[in-house]
Amino acid sequence: MSSFSTTTVSFLLLLAFQLLGQTRANPMYNAVSNADLMDFKNLLDHLEEKMPLEDEVVPPQVLSEPNEEAGAALSPLPEVPPWTGEVSPAQRDGGALGRGPWDSSDRSALLKSKLRALLTAPRSLRRSSCFGGRMDRIGAQSGLGCNSFRY
């Protein structure tokens, strides 16, 4: 035999084994017997008989009757009038305090104070990226931890 025919025959045998192997690619398919499937189906049917159907309509009087156990602890919710889509003059002018919730002077003062606090914080607190001082000391001695790379 020539090398071409040997290669062709070996390729065809390999292809045949691959095709036969793919028919049994899912080992779980044959692992479940028909008897097990029938038992599972019977169990599901039995559970469906015990469970109430979602399509059944519950009478409205059952829903409106207060539960005796929870009825004593619950009080009725106050009626809230529906929103008409109109804004009251107090809301339009900036709320009850006479200014908007995002007054620019208050917001800028808050941002300035936070930035000042960040800049005046100790160096170790500013550079600590994970856990804090203790992890910083461990990292400095062992090379482990969050701050193992110093700038």
Swiss-Prot record:
The record marks R123, S124, C130, F131 as: Cleavage. InterPro entries: Natr_peptide (IPR000663), Natr_peptide_CS (IPR030480), Natriuretic_peptide (IPR050787), Natriuretic_peptide_atrial (IPR002407). GO terms for molecular function: hormone activity; hormone receptor binding; neuropeptide hormone activity; neuropeptide receptor binding; signaling receptor binding. Residues 1-25 form the signal peptide. GO terms for biological process: aortic valve morphogenesis; cardiac conduction system development; cardiac muscle hypertrophy in response to stress; cell growth involved in cardiac muscle cell development; cellular response to angiotensin; cellular response to hydrogen peroxide; cellular response to mechanical stimulus; cGMP biosynthetic process. GO terms for cellular component: brush border; cell projection; collagen-containing extracellular matrix; cytoplasm; extracellular region; extracellular space; glycinergic synapse; mast cell granule. PROSITE patterns: NATRIURETIC_PEPTIDE. Residues 147-151 are annotated as: Important for degradation of atrial natriuretic peptide by IDE. Changing R123G: Loss of cleavage by CORIN. The modification Phosphoserine is found at S129. Keywords: Atrial fibrillation, Cardiomyopathy, Cell projection, Disease variant, Disulfide bond, Hormone, Phosphoprotein, Secreted, Signal, Vasoactive, Vasodilator. Pfam families: ANP. Disulfide bonds join C130-C146. The precursor molecule is proteolytically cleaved by CORIN at Arg-123 to produce atrial natriuretic peptide. Undergoes further proteolytic cleavage by unknown proteases to give rise to long-acting natriuretic peptide, vessel dilator and kaliuretic peptide. Additional processing gives rise to the auriculin and atriopeptin peptides. In the kidneys, alternative processing by an unknown protease results in the peptide urodilatin. It comes from the Eukaryota. Transmembrane segments: none annotated. Residues 62-105 are annotated as: Disordered. The keyword DNA-binding does not apply. Belongs to the natriuretic peptide family. It is linked to Atrial standstill 2: A rare arrhythmia characterized by the absence of electrical and mechanical activity in the atria. Electrocardiographically, it is characterized by bradycardia, the absence of P waves, and a junctional narrow complex escape rhythm. This is Natriuretic peptides A. It comes from Homo sapiens.
